[in-house]
Amino acid sequence: MAAVWRRSARLFILLQRHHSCTFTSQNLNHFMRSQKVMTDQSQTDLGLFKPPSTVRGMTELDRSAFNQTVSVPAIRLPTNILNKAVKSLKKVALQRPGLKRVVEEHSEDGNADCGNIEHRLLLLDPNSITSSDSFGSDEAEALKAYSVPQEIQSYELKLTYENFKSEEILRAVLPEGQGVTSGFSRVGHIAHMNLREHQLPYRKLIGQVIIDKNPGITCVVNKTNTIDSTYRNFQMEVLAGESNMVAKVRENGVLYEFDFSRVYWNPRLSTEHERIVSLLHRGDTVVDVFAGVGPFAIPAARRGCAVLANDLNPESFRWLQHNAKLNKVDQKITTSNLDGRDFIRGPVRERLPALMKGSQKIHVVMNLPALALEFLDAFKGLLDPEPDQSLSNLPQVHCYGFSKENDPQRDVVERAEASLKTNLQGQCSVHLVRNVAPNKEMMCVSFTLPRGVLYKTHTQDRDTSEEPCPKKQKCEDSTN
């Protein structure tokens, strides 16, 4: 019986499986590894630390509107044991962004009593300490040891915009009862957001809050359409900050530079890049059909592999060459700026016979999930027959695809088989890369390229079997 999948809370539960291909899945925690933080309205109530209700509906950021005064519990500590006492009370001390938890006492007129150098106040978490009896046994024993009375007093604390977290600010500003997000993918100094329709009127404010609350972020952009262009880049709107789109990114120890507005880069694929590179050995050859700016090609070259890297996008091609030089591996990478099929039927076909006579492995990476499975047909009858084909070192293919089917594993295998016009039974493995969106998965099917597919037979005529190669391919969104 074929594998039957059910989705529940974005997790896959494999109920029953009997398939010739092996399925592998990374720990689901790794799927979510990215610089992304999502805010859920079901989080614990903020209590005293909610921003003022008057900020609801604000579309232009007014930081002064967040000023307010709240009463919090505090305990009076002698300065001569202050550091020790604060350490002992760390679990119940107040912790808020930009706030000092040790403050001077107020005089009768409400101002700080600068003349009192013998005592200070430690501000306490009002969710933990509500009375003198709220201290736990450890805190109570520590106070007793320091001869400090368990007496709580009220302290008038002035809160400003600086003391609130980004999700707290956005939850207070956006319409109540609707989804709130402070999530973004970080690409160097750029925060890339995918805002929902109801958030768009607040997009400028959201962008400024993200910059204010995330050191190092100097530009916030929002995607304004899906990835439907020839080159997989997308239109974007700058919400806040500078308009500099040239980003510097370090991934798995490799430095990349590129114009984020003109190439494709997804920080959520870092783990997948690392997984494929871990399969490589010094002396192997890597054929990267849709190389982008080099997230597979450059680490492979650094690992001692010979690399043939290609991308149709002239900007990706330019930055691929730039990054190869930047990482001092340009002598190990041969680059092309061709359509994927032209690349396979041109430079790859020319090099493949000699490579297959060697003992080192050949890995073909095809990371264009919206279309790569269709490009597999370029391998059909690619090579002329040889006298002793049994000695050939056949390439290992790693081909990516999206699936919206209930059984994504079976779906991508069947689509690969349809393109190759062969049965991959017992010759492939399928890897779940990540959940892209509800009911949409990114998969990787790996297999040894069948000899019967690669070599031309007497019934095949390459001149008639090859169809014209479309130069412009439409790609669906892979980031959602």
UniProtKB/Swiss-Prot annotation:
Catalytic EC class: transferase
GO terms under biological process: mitochondrial tRNA methylation; tRNA N1-guanine methylation
Catalytic activity: guanosine(37) in tRNA + S-adenosyl-L-methionine = N(1)-methylguanosine(37) in tRNA + S-adenosyl-L-homocysteine + H(+)
Transit peptide, start-end: 1-18
Sequence positions that bind S-adenosyl-L-methionine: 273, 311-312, 339-340, 367
GO CC list: cytoplasm; mitochondrial matrix; nucleus
Keyword Transit peptide: yes
PROSITE patterns reported for this sequence: SAM_MT_TRM5_TYW2
Subcellular location as annotated: Mitochondrion matrix; Nucleus; Cytoplasm
Key words, A-Z: Cytoplasm, Methyltransferase, Mitochondrion, Nucleus, S-adenosyl-L-methionine, Transferase, Transit peptide, tRNA processing
Main location per the UniProt record: mitochondrion
Family recorded in the similarity comment: Belongs to the class I-like SAM-binding methyltransferase superfamily. TRM5/TYW2 family.
Stated role: Involved in mitochondrial tRNA methylation. Specifically methylates the N1 position of guanosine-37 in various tRNAs. Methylation is not dependent on the nature of the nucleoside 5' of the target nucleoside. This is the first step in the biosynthesis of wybutosine (yW), a modified base adjacent to the anticodon of tRNAs and required for accurate decoding.
Name of the protein in question: tRNA (guanine(37)-N(1))-methyltransferase
Organism: Danio rerio
